[in-house]
Regions:
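Bacterial N-terminal signal peptides
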Residues: 1-3
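Signature of Gram-negative chaperone-usher
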Residues: 144, 170, 496-500
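Catalytic cores of secreted or luminal carbohydrate-active enzymes
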Residues: 157-169, 427-444
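Short loop/turn motifs at secondary-structure boundaries
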Residues: 445-555
Length: 555
């Protein structure tokens, strides 16, 4: 009697269960790339005509082969069959995809074109610095939870470096409690919006237009996108316009296990070209703690929706040329007006060292440009290679009383003041954990144009690093340009304690910051101080102003 096998298959009945992307250096398996498939169902499957693929192409069809229930098969290129046959059942395909060591998106497609399973693996999934260098496989933990993503994968524990054609060495039941969530949305044209989820969604619920509504517009079509099924593409009745925001409300969407996502909202909008000053550098950690990572926080200081996949992060080499250009995001990701995003190489490490109030505002880049501990350049470029913002920083900008700046971020004080103004940067407050990634800086202050000649804000300040009134700002307004300034600070006895500015050039308005230190960079005692400001020009005009300020400290 002929064996029964399924003609029509359910998605995830056959899954990708093990990946050998980097076989060298050899641990105990042949020096060949391969993918292992497992039949998780209770019906045999004929793999004839099935194909594997990645972002660069699709393999030739698989041969006539019956994959029995709860069994495995190794798929590879023809030249690897002999070497891998010693470990299990092997079939070959032409044009076997070249598996990238750092990560790739691979998929399994049935003869009828249905995507049965897809994996967007990354080298970070090994969770082991040694094993990710080669010779070890990535194994799926629980084949009955094929949608769980990185939580369901880890490096093999087998002494050979993998378990081709056999039960995985880390096989087990995954206690996955991660709920389906809409991460973000972006417009890929004026009338199409993609919603990105954290895991695959059920195709039928994802394609029901009644499950979506959008402010000041309506949805005419919804499509769940293969091969990962973690995006839904909406077609809109009316085209979107630039510099407008819309809210998408999502209801009744299921994940691949049938769990319903609670009602949720995400923002979206049409991206605009990013010009100079639209996105600014807002915070930088260039000397992390041991085993830590640099980070750069950027801020959208415009009314535009900015696509981070069109921006790059870079530095300058010793000759002063732009170098080490790194694209911020490999996929569309919008930065909305007034929003922050933090760029780093390791989100988990960032959360271990700092309070990350908005984890969804962390973008993990494979590598950041080098930002040395003492001085360097942070450069943001747009799609045309134009400089959007640049900071030439130095560790001398840290608060002078800090003995060790390791793990302390430099924060921008006012987003509307020039990036390169050293007075516009200050060490992050100790009470904020020495860094504020993904939210407003501890030293944040907006300077507004004030009436009068000099104004000191605040009138009482306490330079103790707690993030509250650590800096005194001496703000001036002048009737015309062309003046030179001298700012001198006296104690109550009339002695000069700080020559804050000497022959400083001015505009019609501006400011200088004082951190409470004297000319020898020593902390001054509490008390009342007099700020004396002189402004003069080459035509002999002169303006003199005097004001007082109180320096306070915690008792």
């Amino acid at each position: 009697m002929a064996a029964l096998f399924a003609i029509s298959q359910n998605r995830y009945q056959v899954v990708i269960s093990e990946i050998m992307a980097d076989p060298s250096p050899i641990v105990g398996l042949p020096n060949n790339e391969w993918i292992e498939l497992k039949n998780t169902g209770n019906t045999a499957i004929n793999l004839a005509g099935w194909r594997l693929g990645d972002l660069t192409g699709t393999s030739g069809p698989m041969p006539n082969f019956i994959l029995e229930p709860d069994s495995y098969v190794i798929v590879c290129t023809g030249s690897a069959v002999a070497a891998l046959s010693a470990f299990g059942t092997v079939i070959s395909v032409t044009s076997f995809p070249s598996l990238d060591n750092d990560g790739d998106q691979i998929f399994l497609r049935a003869v009828n074109g249905t995507t049965m399973h897809a994996v967007n693996y990354q080298s970070s999934w090994y969770n082991n610095e040694l094993k990710k260098e080669g010779g070890w496989t990535l194994e799926m933990i629980d084949p009955l939870q094929p949608c769980a993503g990185k939580e369901n994968w880890n490096a093999s524990n087998h002494q050979n470096g993998g378990t081709p054609g056999a039960v995985n060495s880390i096989n087990g039941t995954l206690n996955n409690t991660t709920a389906l969530t809409a991460i973000h949305a972006y417009a890929n044209s004026s009338n199409m919006v993609n919603i990105v989820f954290n895991q695959p969604v059920d195709s039928s619920s994802g394609a029901a237009i009644g499950n979506y509504s959008i402010s000041n517009n309506s949805v005419t079509q919804a499509i769940t996108l293969a091969p990962l099924f973690n995006q839904v593409q909406l077609t809109l009745a009316q085209p979107l316009t630039e510099e407008s925001l819309h809210t998408i409300t999502i209801n009744n969407i299921n994940n691949c296990k049938g769990q319903v996502m609670p009602a949720q909202q995400v923002k979206t909008g049409l991206a605009s070209v990013c010009n100079t000053g639209d996105v600014i550098i807002n915070e930088i950690l260039f000397r992390p703690r041991p085993n830590g990572y640099d980070y750069v926080e950027i801020y959208n200081n415009s009314k535009k929706n900015i696509d981070l996949s069109k921006l790059s992060l870079s530095n300058r080499n010793t000759s002063g040329s732009i170098a080490n250009i790194k694209t911020i995001s490999t996929t569309p990701l919008l930065l909305y007006p007034g929003d922050f995003v933090v760029l780093t190489e390791n989100a988990d490490n960032l959360s271990l060292n700092y309070l990350v109030k908005h984890p969804d505002k962390v973008v993990v880049m494979t590598t950041l440009p080098s930002y040395p501990n003492t001085a360097g350049n942070v450069v943001i470029l747009n799609e045309q290679g134009e400089v959007v913002d640049e900071l030439a920083y130095t560790n001398k900008w840290h608060f002078p009383l800090i003995d060790n700046d390791e793990g302390i971020a430099l924060e921008r004080i006012d987003p509307n003041q020039p990036t390169q103004n050293s007075s516009n940067w200050h060490s992050a407050a100790s009470t904020a954990g020495y860094g504020t990634p993904t939210y407003q800086n501890s030293q944040h202050k907006l300077f507004e144009t004030v009436k009068g000649n000099i104004t000191i804000m605040p009138k009482v300040f306490s330079p103790d690093g707690d993030g509250f009134d650590d800096i005194a700002s001496i703000h001036y307004t002048l009737p015309e340009t062309g003046f030179v300034a001298n700012i001198t600070i006296f104690d109550a006895a009339g002695r000069i304690v700080k020559s804050l500015v000497r022959n400083g050039t001015t505009s019609t308005s501006g400011y200088w910051n004082w951190n409470g230190l004297d000319d020898k960079n020593k902390a001054l005692p509490i008390g009342t101080y007099v700020v004396f400001a002189e402004f003069f020009n080459l035509q002999g005009k002169k303006h003199s102003y005097k004001s007082t300020i109180v320096l306070a400290r915690r008792l």
